[in-house]
Structures are given as C-alpha cells and as structure tokens.
Amino acid sequence: MTEGAKSTIDQGEVDRFSAMAAEWWSPTGKFKPLHKFNPVRLAYIRDKACENFSRDPKSARPLEGLRVLDIGCGGGLLSEPVARMGASVVGADPSEKNIGIASTHAKASGVSVDYRAVTAEGLAEAGETFDIVLNMEVVEHVADVEFFMTTCAKMVRPGGLIFVATINRTMKAAALAIFAAENILRWLPRGTHQYEKLVRPEELEEPLVASGLEITDRTGVSFNPLSNQWNLSKDMDVNYMLLAKRPT
C-alpha cells in the first residue's frame, strides 16, 4: 500500500461518535468525562503554549495570533475555549454530524472557529501548517497510529508544538479506564474504548521523533474522587499527556 492510499480513519469509530453527536455539549450526558477533563487539559495547553511562545498565561487572550488545529474535535469542547484564548482555531473531524453540532454551538456562543469535516491526511496534503496541533483523546480511535502521528507532525511549524492526550495500554488502564469506567461507574458508554487500541507513550513518541520533533514533556493525569477533579500527576499508567516541539 502506498502512503497516499493510507487512511487514519476507523469508520466504525466515526459512526459510533456520530450517533452520539447530539450529546456533546451535555455536561451530564455521554461525554460527561470530557467535560470533567477539560479544565486540566486546557490549563496544560495554555501554560505550556505560553511558556513556549513567551506569553502571559494570566492575560485574557494568551494565545492571540497563534494558529491552532484541534484534530478530532468532536463537538468542539476543546476548540471553543482555545478560540476564546485568542487562537485562530481549525476544528477538524471526519464526522459531518460532529462538525454540524460544533458549528451550531459555536455560532450560538459567539465564538469563531473554522470547523471542517476533513481528515488529518486531507489537511496535511493541502499543505496546512499550525503553531499548535491538539491531538487530544483521539489516537485510541484511529486506524493507524503511526501514520496518524506522522501526518499530524507534518503540520507543526518550526518552533511549534503538538499536544497528545490518551490512555496507556496497561492492565491498570484496562481495569480503571475500561472495566470500571464503562461497566461499574458508567461514566462512558460500553465499547467507548478497546484495550488493543490503547496506546503506550513510546508508540506516540517514536513517530514524532522520527518526524524531527523533540519530546519536551510527559505527564500523567489522575482523577481525585474526593475533589471530583482531574489533576496532573506522575502516574502515567492510565491517562497521560505528552508534548513535542519542532525545533526552529
């Protein structure tokens, strides 16, 4: 198979998320965990981006003037707040239904986001480049992780960043992020995650490094049931985020 014939799309995953599209903006619906997760990942994105681009994280629009890609944007839970930080955001998703929901919500909220029903490879082939690429809770749903990461890396400008958040492929993650989250706590619909599609950090880092990027940060993300909040942690056995930079 030639590289041009490759695809990052797992159509079954696209169809499953399309079927739930109307629930994206319900904080008590099927995407409740993402609503809970949003504050910690937004703070991480803001702080690391400001550190890299010499911005003030306390300013009202700290990402002003930066072009950001939110790949696999879903209903726009991340795209909208990043746009509110001043960034020029392209929200990309292969699901027309997701893009429809995201576009409608952004318009109603008065937020400007360039939503497109397009794949990562479609954007890369068009020569699109960005200061920041957000790859959050997506890699565990794609068809070819290595090709997906390589494709996303191509779109990172010199001096730019790529953020990745996903679930580690460990027995601890299988117990907590799949069995407990889907079957006991019912945080997620059954079948949201499949163990064999979870991704270890090195499986993300290798194609990024091979694409000329440098891994600059890794962090775990853990849920505190007492505070009912997600926090950064040293434990990367379940949820984790990593950051890579293309040298100038």
UniProtKB/Swiss-Prot annotation:
SUPFAM superfamilies: S-adenosyl-L-methionine-dependent methyltransferases. The keyword Methyltransferase applies. This is Ubiquinone biosynthesis O-methyltransferase. Its EC number is 2.1.1.222, 2.1.1.64. It comes from Rhizobium johnstonii (strain DSM 114642 / LMG 32736 / 3841) (Rhizobium leguminosarum bv. viciae). One of its GO terms (biological process) is methylation. It catalyses: a 3-demethylubiquinol + S-adenosyl-L-methionine = a ubiquinol + S-adenosyl-L-homocysteine + H(+); a 3-(all-trans-polyprenyl)benzene-1,2-diol + S-adenosyl-L-methionine = a 2-methoxy-6-(all-trans-polyprenyl)phenol + S-adenosyl-L-homocysteine + H(+). GO terms for molecular function: 2-polyprenyl-6-hydroxyphenol methylase activity; 3-demethylubiquinol 3-O-methyltransferase activity; polyprenyldihydroxybenzoate methyltransferase activity. Keywords: Methyltransferase, S-adenosyl-L-methionine, Transferase, Ubiquinone biosynthesis. The keyword S-adenosyl-L-methionine applies. S-adenosyl-L-methionine binds at residues 41, 72, 93, 136. It comes from the Bacteria.
